[in-house]
A protein has these predicted regions:
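N-terminal secretory signal peptides that target proteins for export/translocation
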Residues: 1-10
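Bacterial N-terminal signal peptides
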Residues: 14-25
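Long, charged/polar, soluble alpha-helical segments
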Residues: 31-230
Length: 230
């Protein structure tokens, strides 16, 4: 068999296969139309999912919610044994922030949900610190023990600056700012007479200010005026 005859025979055998493969390679007319602008009256292409719905962001917000829920459970445990009205109010605000976080997540705003969850976590920690001081729970003093008033003052100063910039004078943020300021005003900063109660009030002031900052961030991300609805 000559080379030309062999080539002709091979080509003849391959033609049916090429005919079958051509639509798969080139695509159907309907597939080709997908890359073109939609004509009037036709269905628009399905949009891509927003970046905030990425699995990584959802994982982060669920992690923040889990942390807030854990601190809420611990603060609620101490609330059954303590009677501090300040701690009770902080715990109430924590529950409200946690509910707002869940609401924001259901609405698709995971960034606002994360900020609300962090606010709930800090509020629960503030309540827990006050309950522990009331019930006499303490621990060995460390570096953070004596630095607590300074850290609280730094967070409070930042909060006051943010409030001035945003012109906030009422609502939960203003309430938390006043709470943090009052708690710090009751702290004895003299190292010779500094006690665990002073440390607990400093921690509560720090977490109250941090919670207010997270509420401010949630407000900016949501734009729904939620800070006046608590």
């Amino acid at each position: 068999m000559t080379m030309r005859a062999s080539f002709t025979r091979t080509l003849g055998c391959s033609l049916p296969i090429l005919v079958l493969l051509t639509p798969l390679v080139l695509g159907s007319p309907a597939q080709a139309q997908r890359g073109r602008p939609s004509a009037p009256g036709t269905a628009a292409p399905v949009p891509m999912q927003p970046s905030w719905q990425s699995p990584r962001e959802l994982e982060r917000v669920n992690h923040d919610l889990a942390k807030a829920q854990r601190d809420l459970a611990e603060a609620s445990f101490f609330a059954q044994r303590g009677s501090s009205p300040e701690a009770a109010r902080l715990l109430e605000l924590s529950r409200q922030s946690f509910a707002e976080a869940q609401k924001a997540l259901q609405g698709g705003n995971v960034f606002a949900a994360r900020e609300q969850a962090k606010a709930a976590e800090n509020l629960a920690k503030a309540a827990k610190a006050l309950y522990k001081a009331e019930l006499g729970f303490g621990g060995p003093p460390g570096r953070s023990f004596f630095e607590a008033p300074l850290r609280a003052q730094e967070s409070l100063s930042r909060l006051q600056a943010e409030m001035t910039f945003a012109n906030i004078t009422s609502g939960p943020v203003a309430e938390l700012q006043q709470q943090a300021q009052q708690l710090l005003g009751r702290v004895n900063a003299d190292p010779a007479s500094y006690t665990f109660a002073d440390y607990s009030r400093s921690k509560a002031a720090f977490h109250s200010a941090r919670a207010a900052l997270h509420l401010l961030a949630a407000e900016r991300l949501s734009g729904l005026g939620s800070l006046s609805s608590f």
